[in-house]
């Protein structure tokens, strides 16, 4: 595998929760009312720094769609899916758009309020007991 070049988005952005790679801009957000197996999901017009899995037919709550899972190009985590085609006329607006699972992305607000707790005990020799 060769060197990975990523796109750095200007301003506030949605990023991969696992490696903080930029994935989408708030200006490309279409809807926050989507759902996935793991909870909430957001629909975007565009997404960057992703790779796509194979196309597959998937039965969603809104009907049958042709979709491909999308993965962060840096860490390889599944972050959502892309709608390639919708079988029902009312769902055609989704074609070519990206769904990012809310639990797998963070935005600038999340980054500024995130708290990290070290759950592993220290193994320092100088630590007092």
Swiss-Prot record:
One of its GO terms (molecular function) is metal ion binding. The keyword Zinc applies. The keyword Lyase does not apply. Zn(2+) binds at residues 16, 19, 72, 75. Keywords: Metal-binding, Zinc. It holds the Pfam family Yippee-Mis18. InterPro entries: Yippee, Yippee/Mis18/Cereblon, Yippee_fam. This is Protein yippee-like At5g53940. Belongs to the yippee family. It comes from the Eukaryota.
